[in-house]
């Protein structure tokens, strides 16, 4: 049974907790990267909204696939996609892990980009599944807000993983979505800025 209205606070708190862990305790997150990527996939699936004019059975299928704190008729919005995009961007940010003891004992700044690169494919695959869900939509404004975070994931994706994703993990519509995202990524990547 779903709540009467969507509780966006739950989404924001999940993202805030993950952001804090990524920013402050990278040493703990590195050992649980499959779990982190799975949670990010679940957050992407939570951004979906049912297509208009679905039948009762189809609507129930969509409602059952969403968390109980999301009312399908009042889906998550642009602010939540911005929040998730910030989390995705944070994954490539270099952070320090403070070792308890003297203040001189600091590790060098590192990001999760390298260890997470093995798991980026499944996050992008989840995004393409959300895009191509026949019973749901991902509105254009939400897709637009997710782009900076998705571009960070594309930056982490090595060529071998990208090719493997294209060949074996995606269907025809997923491949088209991947090509579209990659085209946009390439366009913004080589603008000469930064």
Description of each model-found segment:
Residues 147, 166-169:
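C-terminal/domain-terminus segments
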Residues 10-22, 55-56, 80-105, 142-154:
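Amphipathic alpha-helical elements of HEAT/ARM-like alpha-solenoid repeat scaffolds that form extended
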Residues 12, 69-73:
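Long, acidic/serine-threonine-rich intrinsically disordered regions with weak helical/coil propensity
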Residues 1-7, 18-21, 32-70, 108-135, ...:
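Amphipathic alpha-helical segments within extended alpha-helical solenoids and repeat-rich scaffolds
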């Amino acid at each position: 049974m779903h709540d009467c209205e969507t509780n966006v606070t739950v989404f924001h708190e999940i993202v805030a907790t993950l952001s804090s862990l990524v920013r402050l305790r990278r040493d703990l997150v590195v050992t649980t990267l499959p779990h982190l990527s799975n949670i990010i996939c679940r957050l992407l699936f939570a951004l979906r909204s049912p297509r208009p004019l679905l039948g009762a059975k189809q609507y129930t299928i969509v409602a059952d696939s969403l968390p109980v704190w999301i009312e399908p008729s009042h889906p998550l919005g642009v602010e939540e996609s911005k929040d998730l995009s910030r989390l995705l961007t944070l994954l490539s940010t270099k952070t320090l892990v403070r070792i308890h003891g003297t203040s001189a004992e600091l590790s060098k700044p590192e990001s999760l980009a390298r260890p997470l690169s093995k798991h980026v494919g499944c996050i992008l695959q989840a995004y393409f599944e959300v895009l191509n869900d026949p019973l749901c939509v991902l509105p254009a404004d939400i897709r637009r807000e997710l782009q900076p975070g998705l571009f960070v994931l594309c930056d982490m994706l090595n060529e071998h993983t990208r090719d493997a994703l294209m060949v074996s993990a995606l269907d025809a519509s997923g491949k088209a979505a991947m090509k579209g995202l990659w085209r946009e990524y390439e366009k913004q990547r080589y603008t000469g800025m930064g």
